[in-house]
Swiss-Prot record:
Lineage: Viruses, Varidnaviria, Bamfordvirae, Nucleocytoviricota, Pokkesviricetes
GO cellular component: host cell endoplasmic reticulum membrane; membrane; virion membrane
Pfam families, per the entry: Chordopox_L2
Compartments (UniProt record): Virion membrane; Host cytoplasm; Host endoplasmic reticulum membrane
SUBUNIT field: Interacts with OPG158.
TM stretches of this protein: 39-59, 67-87
Function per UniProt: Early protein involved in virion morphogenesis. Participates in the formation and elongation of crescent-shaped membrane precursors of immature virions in cytoplasmic factories.
UniProt cross-references to InterPro entries, sorted A to Z: Prot_L2 (IPR008447)
Topological category with respect to the lipid bilayer: Multi-pass membrane protein
Native source organism of the sequence: Monkeypox virus
Protein family: Belongs to the orthopoxvirus OPG096 family.
Keyword tags: Early protein, Host cytoplasm, Host endoplasmic reticulum, Host membrane, Membrane, Transmembrane, Transmembrane helix, Virion
UniProt name for this protein: Protein OPG096
Length: 92
């Protein structure tokens, strides 16, 4: 259990260091641009980081759970077809 706690502490420290580095890079990029564009650059970088995190999360989710996701997709398709046929029969 102590090994896991030590590993989690190392991960937290690495995340803090990574965040400081990213903030340093963003700060450098902001000061190369005119003052009027700085908020737009900051917004663009934040959106880019958000998209990267969502992409990584989605790839991990799909790669680890593709079987259950396929079952859920098949279930949704089956229920959709059933509801369409049911509404066609009821409306006639």
């Amino acid at each position: 259990m102590e090994v896991i706690a030590d590993r989690l502490d190392d991960i937290v420290k690495q995340n803090i260091a990574d965040e400081k580095f990213v903030d340093f890079v963003i700060h450098g990029l902001e000061h190369q641009c005119p003052a009027i564009l700085r908020p737009l650059i900051r917004l663009f970088i934040d959106i880019l980081l958000f998209v990267i995190v969502i992409y990584i999360f989605t790839v991990r989710l799909v790669s680890r759970n593709y079987q259950i996701l396929l079952v859920l997709v098949a279930l949704v398709i089956t229920l959709t077809i059933f509801l369409l046929l049911y509404t066609i029969i009821v409306l006639d």
